[in-house]
Structure formats: structure tokens, C-alpha cells
A protein has these predicted regions:
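Membrane-proximal basic amphipathic "stem/tether" segments
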Residues: 1-40
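Solvent-exposed, charged interface segments at domain starts and junctions
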Residues: 1-2, 48-49, 53, 60, ...
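Generic, low-specificity signal for short hydrophobic/alpha-helical stretches with a mild N-terminal bias
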Residues: 28, 38-41, 91, 157, ...
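Short, flexible hinge/linker loops that cap or flank conserved catalytic cores
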Residues: 36-37, 50, 206
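Conserved SAM-binding loop
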Residues: 41-131, 214-218
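S-adenosyl-L-methionine-dependent methyltransferase catalytic module, highlighting the catalytic core
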Residues: 101-104, 108-114, 118-217
């Protein structure tokens, strides 16, 4: 395997190929969980990617040095004790897994949360794109998020549904029904940096224009 140009100024763990090798080796192996660092933490960030937060247990499919748990959330239950979390946060992650896996994860979230705990789910909002598409067909001069890089509005629709490894794009009604099915209550559509638990408001500003924000309680 070629690693490309090497620099002594970079840590070896900063190379994408190194991270990929480590990910494949440690993924879903509890022995590699950073249990000492996450001891006592009651907030979970699912799919944190390159934006881990020290106040959270940071879980991702791809390993980097800051990841606490390298895990495939479509293969095994979360390696976290039931009813041990105050909050769960996930931003632009769950659209990358299949519909059935999403449903399974809602049940897992319910298991992990303490009574009264909150889940905050952020993902691309299919309704935003479809609504703007119809408005454009009706003659309005409006643009979908990031539409300028696509050939036509329909190409943009396909982009949000198919690009970047997306498996399923949701609207509020679909997420609400799946949360209800898992046992959640008080399910509400929120907005950027608005929600019931201030500790879960770590949203990425650049994603606000296209995102669906949903919160629910156990």
C-alpha cells in the first residue's frame, strides 16, 4: 500500500491511509474503547467525524486519535450500559445507514438513555429540497442549498439522495414515526442551536441551511 508523500512534520496517525488501517483493525473491538477518558461522561456523539467534543463520548466508524469508540452501528449494539446517558447527539450521520438500521438505532438510543434523557438528530431535510423543487416548477426564483454546482434542479435532488454515501433521506414525519415506534415521546422539530438541552447544542453552522433538527425524550 502506498502512503503518498511523507513528511516528518506530520504525525503518522494524521494520514488517512493509516487511519483507515487502524479503523479496520480496532472497529467493534471493546478492548480499544477509551474507557478511562469516557468514564463518567453521560453525553454521546454518534458519527462525530472530524469534530469530536471533549464533553461527549465520541463514536465514529472511522478512527482518528480523538475517537473514543470506533464502531459500526449497523453491526453490533452500542458498547454502552443501558440507561446511562443524559443525551445523544448525531449530526449528518444516520442518512448514511439503511432505513432498517436507522430504526434499530432508534431502539438503541432509547435503551441507552436515562428516563427523561434527550436525543437530538440532525440530518439533511428531504422536505426542504422537494418543497423548493415544486416551487421552482411553479415559477418561483428560488434555489436549493448548494444547487449552483448541479446541472439542473433534478440533478440536485438526486445529489442529496445518492451522493456522499447517503442511503435514505428523511423528513420530520418519517423520523417522528420511527422515534414513536422506539418508545420516545415529546418529539419536536427544532432549529439550528435551538433545543431543550443546552449541552446538545453543538450544531455546525454551515449545515443549517439544509438540515432537519429533531429532538425527543425518553
Amino acid at each position: 500500500m502506498k502512503f503518498g508523500k511523507f513528511s516528518f512534520r506530520r504525525k503518522i496517525t494524521s494520514y488517512t491511509k493509516v487511519q483507515s488501517i487502524v479503523s479496520d483493525f480496532i472497529r467493534c473491538k471493546p478492548v480499544f474503547i477509551k474507557r478511562k477518558r469516557i468514564q463518567g461522561l453521560t453525553l454521546l456523539n454518534v458519527g462525530c467525524g472530524p469534530f469530536p467534543n471533549k464533553s461527549f463520548i465520541n463514536l465514529d466508524y472511522c478512527w482518528t486519535p480523538e475517537i473514543d469508540i470506533c464502531w459500526d452501528i449497523t453491526r453490533k449494539p452500542y458498547p454502552i450500559e443501558s440507561a446511562s446517558l443524559e443525551g445523544i447527539y448525531t449530526e449528518h450521520c444516520l442518512e448514511h445507514i439503511g432505513f432498517n438500521d436507522f430504526e434499530n438505532n432508534m431502539r438503541e438510543f432509547f435503551r441507552l438513555l436515562k428516563p427523561g434523557g434527550t436525543v437530538r438528530i440532525i440530518m439533511p431535510d428531504g422536505e426542504i429540497y422537494l418543497d423548493i423543487y415544486q416551487r421552482k416548477k411553479n415559477g418561483e426564483q428560488v434555489l436549493m442549498p448548494h444547487e449552483e454546482t448541479y446541472l439542473t434542479p433534478m440533478a440536485r435532488i438526486n445529489g442529496i439522495f445518492r451522493n456522499h454515501g447517503h442511503r435514505f433521506i428523511y423528513d420530520f414525519d418519517t423520523v417522528k414515526k420511527l422515534l414513536e415506534k422506539a418508545g420516545f415521546k415529546d418529539i419536536k422539530k427544532e432549529s439550528y442551536l435551538q433545543g431543550r438541552d443546552k449541552f446538545l447544542l453543538i450544531d455546525t453552522e454551515s449545515r443549517a441551511i439544509e438540515s432537519l433538527y429533531v429532538e425527543a425524550s425518553k
